[in-house]
Amino acid sequence: MEGGSFGAGRAGAALDPVSFARRPQTLLRVASWVFSIAVFGPIVNEGYVNADSGPELRCVFNGNAGACRFGVALGLGAFLACSCFLLLDVRFQQISSVRDRRRAVLLDLGFSGLWSFLWFVGFCFLTNQWQRTAPGPGTAQAGDAARAVITFSFFSILSWVALTVKALQRFRLGTDMSLFATEQLGAGAGQTYPGYPVGSGVEGTDTYQSPPFTETLDTSPKGYQVPAY
């Protein structure tokens, strides 16, 4: 298994709940999670008020239903994303593949950057619509909720920008391949390869030599005499 990549511990290592809860990235996700509830919650509960001329409900932000829908979608999306990314952070050390870790970090980086931009757009849009809202009984009743939505939209910009920076830092850490190569070379340098074992029947460097003659061989047969002519 490949470990120690993208700012996480070695793959398969046990997760320390205390150190995980104290991580800046975890604290930022929890803060963003709370801010998202503080945005879409007031809009759902108090974001629609009675119009002065009739019983129909209108969005407190200048009667623009698109502003309320955008705020709810933005906050609800951030709420679900923070929940999913928190679970991903918990399981991140169990991911053994460096490629899968890289994809997870890229997903975090891309989504955090996108939501930072959307929070900025939402903050500007809601602020503009609130400034154009005409005063009235319904507006005065839901004024605190509208101001809370705008305030926590601004806080969400800061928290998501910080999450983007943390994801970028983790992506730049990448995989410490030099450390991985050093460990491999260190393990291979002290390893020796044994030769042929003694008594295995295989000779390494000895060459075959014919045994020396201990006596001169007589090629003529015994008992035979050459006849004389």
From Swiss-Prot:
Any keyword Protease?
no
Q: Where is the MARVEL domain?
A: 20-172
User: Major location, coarse class?
Assistant: membrane
Q: How does it sit in the membrane?
A: Multi-pass membrane protein
What's a Pfam family in this record?
MARVEL
Entry keywords, A to Z:
Acetylation, Cytoplasmic vesicle, Membrane, Synapse, Transmembrane, Transmembrane helix
Q: Tell me yes or no: is Transport among this UniProt entry's keywords.
A: no
- The record lists the membrane-crossing segments as 30-50, 70-90, 105-125, 148-168
Matching entries from PROSITE patterns are given as:
MARVEL
- N-acetylmethionine modification, residue list: 1
Where it sits in the cell: the answer is: Cytoplasmic vesicle, Secretory vesicle, Synaptic vesicle membrane; Synapse
Q: Which GO terms describe its cellular component?
A: neuromuscular junction; synaptic vesicle; synaptic vesicle membrane
What is one process in the GO biological process aspect for this record?
Answer: regulated exocytosis
Q: Which InterPro entries match?
A: Marvel, Synaptogyrin
Which family is it part of?
A: Belongs to the synaptogyrin family.
Function text = May play a role in regulated exocytosis. May indirectly regulate the activity of the plasma membrane dopamine transporter SLC6A3 and thereby regulate dopamine transport back from the synaptic cleft into the presynaptic terminal.
Assembly, in brief, is: Interacts (via N-terminus) with SLC6A3 (via N-terminus). May interact with VMAT2.
Protein name, UniProt field: Synaptogyrin-3
